[in-house]
């Protein structure tokens, strides 16, 4: 059975959920609590004493049961309270960095059973959730919103810079004057935007219903970013052949695996794309295959763009093709040929206009 991840568990504890309501009632009562979010034979094996309930979950019931010293065990889906006032007896040999008895039991139980375990400290009024070997302190919405709003401001600055370098790359593509450095600059900015977006997305998940406005802002700022990453990999990977889906995914995974320090190093980015890792190579000329440019043509499907790239090889060859040349490609009829030809002409004109403005 697949065990819940930390992200999934945090979403279950977000404002607007029944579990969060119960936790807030416990915090206000300052009684503390130990709650296991799942039940099977592994959980039963570490439970001692207490009593079976098997009643429907309700925040008020959780609050009342938490007044007792023992732990509360919920069903795996969280819909029922299975047991209450039980003593958790996990394997004491499991390593833990916690000092309090409740927190040590929670961490060990989470590791041993694979289910999330929540510990509520009555003295510090803090909720901590343990998932496997991970530990997460649940913050209040005001704290998360303050942090997320600062991150949104940073993301907006990153997005402005990304748009600038993307326009510069598009202009260089039309003029056939692209260097590897131009490409890596855009790749770097795309990745920076994606990473800070992930941080904010985690905050949005933790905010639950309190993060709706933040979700709208994030979606607007990140719209098309993942697609742009895929297109630039297809356009500029050093492979002499068109990338397969597996190769493209592997390249994106390599980008994901770069540390923040490596992301600032163009030689590390060049290596991911299959280019030499020398500084001199960054000023070498490269030619796009044309996926990015063709994606800018309204209503043009990827399948049609892929046909054109595989037939003509480079963007410059596509730009030089007439409507009849485009129509000669199997799968590209007269209507699409005219549409592509007009779209490329408009793209070139708008790019030149932007460079003059």
From Swiss-Prot:
EC numbers for this chain: 2.7.7.85
Domain DAC: 3-141
Protein name listed in UniProt: DNA integrity scanning protein DisA
Entry similarity comment: Belongs to the DisA family.
Biological process according to GO: DNA repair
PROSITE patterns for this protein: DAC
Catalyzed reaction equations: 2 ATP = 3',3'-c-di-AMP + 2 diphosphate
Cofactor requirements of the protein: Mg(2+)
Signal peptide start and end residues: none
Keywords for this protein: ATP-binding, DNA damage, DNA repair, DNA-binding, Magnesium, Nucleotide-binding, Nucleotidyltransferase, Transferase
Quaternary assembly: Homooctamer.
InterPro entries noted in UniProt: DisA, DisA/LigA_HHH, DisA_sf, DNA_integrity_DisA_N_sf, DNA_integrity_scan_DisA_link, DNA_integrity_scan_DisA_N, DNA_integrity_scanning_protein, RuvA_2-like
């Amino acid at each position: 059975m697949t065990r819940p991840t930390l992200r999934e568990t945090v979403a279950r504890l977000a404002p607007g959920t029944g579990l969060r309501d119960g936790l807030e009632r416990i915090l206000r009562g300052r009684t503390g609590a130990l709650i296991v979010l799942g039940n099977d034979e592994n959980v039963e094996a570490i439970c001692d004493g207490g009593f079976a309930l098997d009643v429907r979950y309700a925040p008020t019931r959780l609050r009342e049961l938490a007044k007792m010293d023992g732990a509360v065990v919920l069903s795996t889906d969280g819909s029922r309270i299975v047991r209450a006032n039980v003593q958790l007896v996990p394997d004491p040999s499991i390593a833990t960095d916690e000092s309090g008895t409740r927190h040590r039991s929670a961490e060990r139980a989470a590791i041993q059973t694979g289910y999330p375990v929540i510990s509520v400290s009555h003295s510090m009024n803090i909720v901590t959730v343990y998932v496997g070997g991970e530990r997460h302190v649940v913050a209040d919405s005001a704290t998360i919103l303050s942090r997320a709003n600062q991150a949104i401001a940073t993301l907006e600055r990153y997005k402005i810079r990304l748009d600038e370098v993307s326009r510069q790359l598009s202009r260089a593509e039309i003029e056939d004057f692209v260097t590897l450095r131009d490409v890596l600059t855009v790749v770097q900015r795309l990745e920076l935007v994606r990473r800070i977006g992930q941080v904010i997305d985690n905050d949005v998940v933790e905010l639950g219903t309190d993060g709706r406005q933040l979700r709208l802002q994030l979606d607007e700022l990140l719209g098309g970013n993942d697609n742009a990453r895929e297109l630039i990999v297809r356009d500029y990977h050093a492979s002499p052949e068109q990338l397969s889906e597996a190769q493209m995914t592997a390249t994106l995974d390599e980008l994901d695996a770069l540390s923040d320090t490596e992301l600032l190093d163009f030689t590390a980015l060049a290596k991911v794309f299959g280019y030499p890792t020398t500084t001199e190579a960054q000023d070498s000329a490269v030619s796009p295959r044309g996926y990015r440019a063709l994606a800018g043509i309204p209503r043009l499907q990827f399948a049609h763009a892929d046909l054109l790239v595989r037939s003509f090889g480079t963007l410059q060859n596509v730009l030089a093709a007439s409507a009849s040349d485009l129509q000669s490609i199997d799968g590209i009829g007269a209507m699409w040929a005219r549409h592509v030809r007009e779209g490329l002409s408009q793209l070139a004109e708008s790019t030149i206009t932007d460079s003059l403005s």
